[in-house]
Every structure is written in C-alpha cells, then in structure tokens.
Amino acid sequence: MGNNFWSTWSPSQRIFSLIWPATILYLIMKLLIEKMWGKNRGAVERFQTRREALFDDFKSRSAPASLVNNPRIVKGNETAEQIETTFNEILKLDLIALKSALQTDKYNAYTVLCAFVWRAIDVNSEINCITEVIREAFNTAEALDDNYAQTGEKGQLFGLPFSVKSNFYMENYDVTVGLAKLLEQPKTTTCPMVQFLSDQGAVPFCLTNVPQGLLSYVSSNPIYGTTKNPWDFSRTPGGSSGGEAALLAAGGAAFGIGSDLAGSLRIPAAFCGLVTLKPTQDRLCVTDTHGGLPGRGRLGLSFGFYTRSVKEQEFLLGLIVGRSEYLELCPMSSPAKLEKHIEKDQKLVIGWFVDDGFNPVVPSNRRAVEETVKSLQAKGHQVVELKLADVSEEFPPFAVADMLFRNVMPDNGAYMSEMYAGEQYDEHMKLFIRLVCLKQNFLVSFLLRYGVMPFAKLALSKRLACIGSAYNSDLAACRQNQENTDSYKLQWIRYWKSKKIDALICPSFITPAQPFEYPAQLSNGAFITGLFNMLDVPAGVVPVSPVNQKDVDQLIDGFSTEGDLLLKKQREAARGTTGLPNAVQVVTLPNCEEMCLRVMRLVEESAEGVQRLQWRVGASAAPIDVENTPAGVVSSLEHFERVNLLH
C-alpha cells in the first residue's frame, strides 16, 4: 500500500518529500548552534570592550606627547618631536643592533618598549594583528631598568620587546584560539619559552592573532577578526602564526615566536618576507601551549622564531636550544646545544626540487628555487635534482599525501568537530569547518570515499579526491597509517643518504600570499610544508627576490591546471601578486639545525632584490599609481615604504 501511495506522487512531490526533512534538520541545527553561540556572546562583547580600552590605554601611554618630562625616557628627549625622532631611530634598527644599543645604555628598556608599543598600536589599527596587549609590559620594562640601576646586571635579551602567538599560555590570560567557548578561562601557568625569554630580559608586550581553531592558513576568527598582510591588505599573512608574521613584517616587534604543525611558521614567513626555522620537534620542545591537535598522529610539532635575517635566527636559537636554564623549565627538550659551523668555506652538496609530485607550484615559486640553486652552483656548491617519486616505490607522492592528511586527522575530525561545536564559523573558514565536521560522520565519510571522491577524481580534482578520501576507517587503519609513516621516514633518510646531500632546497609554498577566501579551498597547499612535519626534520624559510610581472604573466601559459579544480583555484589565488614576497624552503636531516641555518645563510647571501617594509614617516617620495596598482597594495603603500635590503 505504501508503495502504491508513493507511486501516485509526481517527481516534484517526491523530491520535496526528501528535501523538507533535511531542511528542518538544518534549521534545528542552525538554531542550536546560534543558541550556543548566544551563550558565549556576552563573553565576546565583554572581552572586546576590555580589548579596545587596553589598546587605548597603551596608545596613550606610548604617545610621544604624553612622555614629555617622563623621567624614564632616556635623556636628551625633552620634546614630543625629539621623542618621536628617537622612536623612529629605534624602530629602524635590526635585532642585533638594537640588542647592542640596549646593552651599551644608548637606550633603556622603557624607552624601547614605548617605541614598539607606539608603532604596534598604529600597525594594528591597519592590519588587525594583535589580539590582546600584555598589561604588565610597562611594569616589566620599569623593573628591568630599576634592577639594572641597582645591580649593574643585564640579561642577554635585556629590553627587547617581543610578541607572542596567542596559543602560548601566559598566566592570567585566556588562550581561546578564536573560540568563544574558551573566553574567560585564564591560564594559571606561563609557557616555558615565554618564561625563558622573559628571564633573559626580553619583554612580552602583546598576543597575536590566529585562525579559528588554529587549523588554517588564514588568520581570522569571529572574536578578533581578520588579520591583513601588510604587503597587500587584500591578502592573508598566512597561518596559523599569521598575526605574529604580520606584526613583525610591519615593524611592530623586535622578534616574534610561534608554532608549526603543518607549516604554521613557514607559510606566514613566506607570505610576509620573513625568516624562520622549524626545528626537529625535540630539539626545542615547548609545553603549555594549545597545539591545535592534541593527540595528533605522526606530526612533529615545532616552535621557533620570526626574524628579519638568518643571523637573528642563529642568535635566538643559539640562546635557547640546549641551554640548562631552559631545560630546567622544559626537561623534555634536547640538551644538545646549537653548535657554530667553523668550515664556512667548505663546498656543500645541495639537493633540490620544484615539483613534489602531488601539487605543482606557480611560476614565481618555481623560479625562486631555480634561481637560488643556480646562484649556489655558481659559487661552487654541487647541486643534485631530486624526485620525490623516487624516494619510495611503496609510497608514491599521492600515497604520501594521503598518509599526511590521515595524520592530521587520525580521529577523522572528531576532535575538531567538537572544538567547533556551538561556535559561530569565521567567514573565511566556513567551507573548511563544514567539511571537517562532515568528515567525522562514518556514513558521510563512506559516501565521500567510495561515491563522491572517485567521481571527483575523474571529473573535478584528483587532489581534492585525495584529501577527501583520507580516512582512517578503524583503529587498525590508524595504526597502519602510523606504521606507514615510520616506514616512509626511514626510506626518506635512505634516499637522502644515497644522494649524499647536505641540505635540500624546495618551494616554500604553492603560491605567494593569497586573498582571504582561498586558504579554505586550497588545503592541498599544506603538503609541501606538512611533509616536513611528518618527517620531523628541520625546515626553514628564507626570502628571495620578490614576485615579478613575468611570473604573473606565466600563470596563463606556464602553469598547467590539468583540468583540476584546485589547480584552477591556485592559479586564481596567485594573480595580482607582483611585488609580493617570495621565498624558498631549506630542509636538512633530523637534528641538523646547524646545517639548515648554514644553508639558509648561503641562500640569504645569494638573494637579490629582497625588500623590507618600513612604516611611512611623512609623505610618500613618489606618487602611487592607483589605477594600475591592486587596491590592497595601494592601502599598504599608504602606510609602508619598501626598503631594499643589502646583504
């Protein structure tokens, strides 16, 4: 009888009968989410009110006009104009020069902090990179100066203001990672990395923005908003350490600290023109942070610094890695100190590739590697082209990509779905979050893997199909993937040894900085960075010559999309990138950070045309060609000058 009843319905009635229950279910779920978000809305509003009040307070306390006659400002600065001139002098110094000026009493900690706060608040008003200021910063600087006056002693980082990625625990501060449910739950401890740097005399003065839940390379969330790239305000600085990179690139901190689970330090460094190094996980272990994926698979979680030069990286890493004082705070970290290489004239064997076998890179990023390799070869170093397909017959590149994405979500997204439950989804991450939440459902994942994704592989994108079908069906599959990962690591090292190379140079990412809407659509980009977390090897990023117009022109004829939807999106994301930072990635074997830094220095010395942003003081020396310049770049040029670096 039921079948006869169904047969009397028209096709449109049948379709409607299937759609309306799904619609009602969607509306119920939407109502539940909005109700839960409403429960946290009060906390969000209270926080945002406090945040703006503290920004105003810091702006007032650091304004040159308010510091006239302040006895803590270094002598010789009696007027607001003199103080502003001194601030600009301070802000033009690199980290090593600023350290020297502080150690030799040219400046004191309080004056330097005021200079950086003054600049950081202005920068933040344009690019929204700071989530919160650290209330104790001025008291900390005053205490440093007072202690020096009494004892004559200074720590190695005396008075250097630094920024902190907001997933690092700091006592009495929330760690929300952009999730409203985590507001008003201040931490009771400070992470050992921040504590060690503070013990050495550095001054943490602000926390910086991250993606909602950390797991993206667009630094945006409903609590703190979207962070803009200081080179182009219409593009992301990357993520998840995007707020850190944006602030440092804009000159708002002496240095910054961040974490890296699948490229979270390296992608922002590449997008913002900075230097960073992701160490082997245990070489610099850091506890008391939100790692993004507690209980993750075989992925090395690393911590490191953002600087403007390799020399600054060497200084900061040399200060903390293997130091007994740091081991007291974090005993799990390796006791092996960073050694200095003496044999600087020794010629090296450098491996390289431009295609990882999974996802091609756009012409600008390919050229960055090819020019760097050619320059090193001209200086007498031997270069050897590598092919990732030759690493393992058992695991070709697409199988390695599947391995990586299973390691990212060993529980098929269950933890991430719980993390996002009841949250308002960020506008730039909606697609990513919805796909993650869908994937943890067994039935949906089964349909995706055996129904939708085989079709997608043929009709849309084999890369999308690979990502969508990366699923651990049960505990046995999860265990097998971890065994495969361990096996691939060994095969990687054997392949490396067979080529007798000292280091590897490869693309830093698949594109330069992308518009905000693309990271959620281009998870395929994470392979070129996440691979080295899965292998748990040192990987650094060094800026090279910026993107040029020829690179952009070649997107049409020099970058094949293969009819692949994701590659088409990738090409779109790379349009209009002329003048933006470009970079290469340097990789070595596990625990060989010293060699990685050495090759990074060689790359830095061979790079030409690298630029640095500098906050504009006074009118622009040259008019901006508004008609032929992207709007986001125009906004950047109104506030920042581009200064050529000389090595």
UniProtKB/Swiss-Prot annotation:
Disruption phenotype: Extended lifespan, increased food consumption and increased resistance to oxidative stress induced by paraquat. Increased levels of mono- and polyunsaturated monoacylglycerides, including endocannabinoid 2-arachidonoylglycerol. Lifespan is further extended following treatment with the benzodioxole 4-[bis(1,3-benzodioxol-5-yl)-hydroxymethyl]-1-piperidinecarboxylic acid (4-nitrophenyl) ester (JZL184). It catalyses: Hydrolyzes glycerol monoesters of long-chain fatty acids; N-(5Z,8Z,11Z,14Z-eicosatetraenoyl)-ethanolamine + H2O = ethanolamine + (5Z,8Z,11Z,14Z)-eicosatetraenoate; 2-(5Z,8Z,11Z,14Z-eicosatetraenoyl)-glycerol + H2O = glycerol + (5Z,8Z,11Z,14Z)-eicosatetraenoate + H(+). InterPro entries: Amidase_CS, Amidase_dom, AS_sf, Endocannabinoid_amidase. Pfam families: Amidase. Disulfide bonds: none annotated. Gene3D superfamilies: Amidase signature (AS) domain. The active site is at K165, S240, S264. Its EC number is 3.1.1.23, 3.5.1.99. One of its GO terms (molecular function) is fatty acid amide hydrolase activity. It is an enzyme of class 3 (hydrolase). One of its GO terms (biological process) is fatty acid catabolic process. Inhibited by the benzodioxole 4-[bis(1,3-benzodioxol-5-yl)-hydroxymethyl]-1-piperidinecarboxylic acid (4-nitrophenyl) ester (JZL184). The keyword Protein transport does not apply. Signal peptide: none annotated. It comes from the Eukaryota. Keywords: Hydrolase, Lipid degradation, Lipid metabolism, Serine esterase. Belongs to the amidase family. Converts monoacylglycerides to free fatty acids and glycerol. Hydrolyzes the endocannabinoid 2-arachidonoylglycerol (2-AG), and thereby regulates the degradation of endocannabinoid-related monoacylglycerides. Also hydrolyzes arachidonoyl ethanolamide (anandamide, or AEA), but with low efficiency. Plays a role in the regulation of longevity and resistance to oxidative stress. PANTHER family: FATTY ACID AMIDE HYDROLASE, MONOGLYCERIDE LIPASE FAAH-4. This is Monoglyceride lipase faah-4.
